[in-house]
């Protein structure tokens, strides 16, 4: 159970692919102009990570070490092609919006990195969980960045959600404030870099605060009974 918890915590927070490893920044910065686009690409990446980790872990004993990387890339490309066709069939609007960034998941360092670092060494169930956790960590980062950019830039949230979830999702659109002239800085690539920088700073501050609280709690437990540590 502790290993499962560690895999989940590492993927979602401690070893977050976007905020700690800084991998896959090209799609992260390019696609996150809206929350819908960010969520769509994040979920697609999560599905690819989960399936490729599961497949590579299952086949790890039959994969020659000398040619393992080309085999990993072939497996990843096959899964990405299947996911691309699914999005094309069931979410064509999202497919058009994401464009080239769906097939580019094949070259995403996150996918190949987890295959080599984790799936090739661990069992199928734990590898699938690792892929899912890493993918959801990246999805959360994309979603937060996309939401911030959409709110600041257009004053809306979940605009175009019907492209991802179907016509019923039009009711999810929220207009936080009305604007006739969008704030282009937030919608263009410079806004993505600024937003990512703020998210990195925020995560650092949260980690430092948590580290300080753990240190204070450990110091209090180490004191003899009745002592408070105050002079």
From Swiss-Prot:
GO terms for biological process: electron transport chain. The chain crosses the membrane at residues 18-38, 39-59, 63-83, 86-106, 125-145, 182-202. The keyword Cytoplasm does not apply. Keywords: Cell inner membrane, Cell membrane, Electron transport, Membrane, Translocase, Transmembrane, Transmembrane helix, Transport. Residues 1-17, 60-62, 107-124, 203-231 are cytoplasmic. Residues 84-85, 146-181 are periplasmic. It comes from the Bacteria. It is a multi-pass membrane protein. One of its GO terms (cellular component) is plasma membrane. Its EC number is 7.-.-.-. Coiled coil: none annotated. It is an enzyme of class 7 (translocase). It is found in: Cell inner membrane. Its main location: membrane. The complex is composed of six subunits: RsxA, RsxB, RsxC, RsxD, RsxE and RsxG. NCBIfam families: PRK12405.1 (NF009070), rnfE (TIGR01948). Belongs to the NqrDE/RnfAE family. Part of a membrane-bound complex that couples electron transfer with translocation of ions across the membrane. Required to maintain the reduced state of SoxR. Probably transfers electron from NAD(P)H to SoxR. This is Ion-translocating oxidoreductase complex subunit E. The gene is rsxE.
């Amino acid at each position: 159970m502790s290993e499962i918890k560690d895999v989940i915590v590492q993927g979602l927070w401690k070893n977050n692919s976007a905020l700690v490893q800084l991998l896959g920044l090209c799609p992260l910065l390019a696609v996150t102009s809206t929350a819908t686009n960010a969520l769509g690409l994040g979920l697609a990446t999560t599905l690819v990570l989960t399936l490729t980790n599961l497949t590579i872990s299952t086949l790890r004993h039959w994969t020659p070490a000398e040619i393992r990387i080309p085999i990993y890339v072939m497996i990843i490309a096959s899964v990405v092609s299947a996911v691309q066709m699914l999005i094309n069939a069931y979410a064509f609007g999202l497919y058009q919006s994401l464009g080239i960034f769906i097939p580019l998941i094949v070259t995403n360092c996150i996918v190949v990195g987890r295959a080599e670092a984790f799936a090739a060494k661990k069992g199928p169930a734990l590898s699938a969980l690792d892929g899912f956790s890493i993918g959801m960590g990246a999805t959360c980062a994309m979603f937060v960045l996309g939401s911030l950019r959409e709110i600041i830039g257009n004053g809306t949230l979940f605009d175009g959600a019907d492209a991802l979830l179907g016509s019923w999702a039009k009711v999810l659109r929220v207009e936080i404030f009305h604007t006739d002239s969008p704030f282009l800085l937030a919608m263009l690539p410079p806004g993505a870099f600024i937003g990512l920088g703020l998210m990195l700073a925020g995560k650092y501050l949260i980690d430092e605060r948590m580290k300080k609280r753990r240190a204070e709690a450990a110091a209090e437990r180490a004191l003899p009974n009745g002592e408070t540590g105050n002079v």
